[in-house]
Amino acid sequence: MATRIPFDESYWEEYLSGQEASLPALPAVTQLSPRVTRLLAGNPGIMQLQGTNTYLVGTGPARILIDTGEGRPVWHATLAEHLRTHHLTLEYILLTHWHGDHTGGIPDLIAHDPTLQSRIYKHHPDRGQRPIRDGQRFTVTGATVRAVFTPGHAIDHMCFLIEEEKALLTGDNVLGHGFAIVQDLAEYMASLARMAALGCERGYPAHGAVIENLPAKMQLYIHHNEVRVQQVITALASVVKLPGKRVGMTVPEIGRAIYGEVPREIVENAIVPFLSQVLWKLAEDRKVGFEPGEANKRRWFGLVTQQ
């Protein structure tokens, strides 16, 4: 498994705030299809876009809830009012992954109805929760939801396929706007390929607007990552070879080869973390090697020949 590189949110705050300001507004509650209702979690932010999307799935009185937001009172009040008004109950609570903006609403749910504790499912369950198996199905009137294990954004990330719609709840792996933050690039790219192979037409992301053309969005995400991987391979292949000596490049040197001379702050806070993810993925694929040393002084070299 590739080394996980932390994302420096503070460095990107100004840029991300600008992105947030340009996002389309989403209503607090929206009926997206005959069997899918979106409830915003009331937590807009630079990483959450318009807020975390939580979903009620099904057409009968018992519904499946996907994710719980981060624990804002407005979300719990909205959910409770919606359930009361439409005479609904929660049969299953499925969590896409462990991040707090998806699991933070659990205490309020349990406080309201302690019996819900035994209906909470997560791939790596916390105490009192139940595990989700890859391929496991959850059925209520009007909807069958199948779990698809898709690690990368998080180690326990799950997507959920609604079989009646050929629609995919994409979690944080694919967003309605922009691109996702990745914990493990190798796992993430494998998960993107698996998600694309499902052949779903519509995407319900955990953040942002509905993805009406999911195949096109999947190809965009896959291409986005493939281009950046190829840039690193090309940069390493450009190193002049010396007879009898293995010559490599440090991560900052690779960054300069790809992006030119940029401010040191950008190199340290953005370029180095991202390129490190790419390099560890390529090392797993046996396309690059490295010499031992400190992270930014370690020299990397290609093991493949450019065509």
UniProtKB/Swiss-Prot annotation:
Enzyme Commission number(s) of this protein: 3.1.-.-
Any Gene Ontology biological process: viridicatumtoxin biosynthetic process
Needed cofactors: Zn(2+)
Active-site residues from the entry: 101
Keyword Isomerase set for record: no
Function text: Lactamase-like protein; part of the gene cluster that mediates the biosynthesis of viridicatumtoxin, a tetracycline-like fungal meroterpenoid with a unique, fused spirobicyclic ring system. The first step of the pathway is the production of the malonamoyl-CoA starter unit for the polyketide synthase vrtA. The aldolase vrtJ may be involved in the synthesis of the malonamate substrate for malonamoyl-CoA synthetase vrtB. The polyketide synthase vrtA then may utilize the malonamoyl-CoA starter unit, followed by sequential condensation of eight malonyl-CoA units to form the polyketide backbone.
Protein name in UniProt: Lactamase-like protein vrtG
UniProt source species: Penicillium aethiopicum
Chain's gene name: vrtG
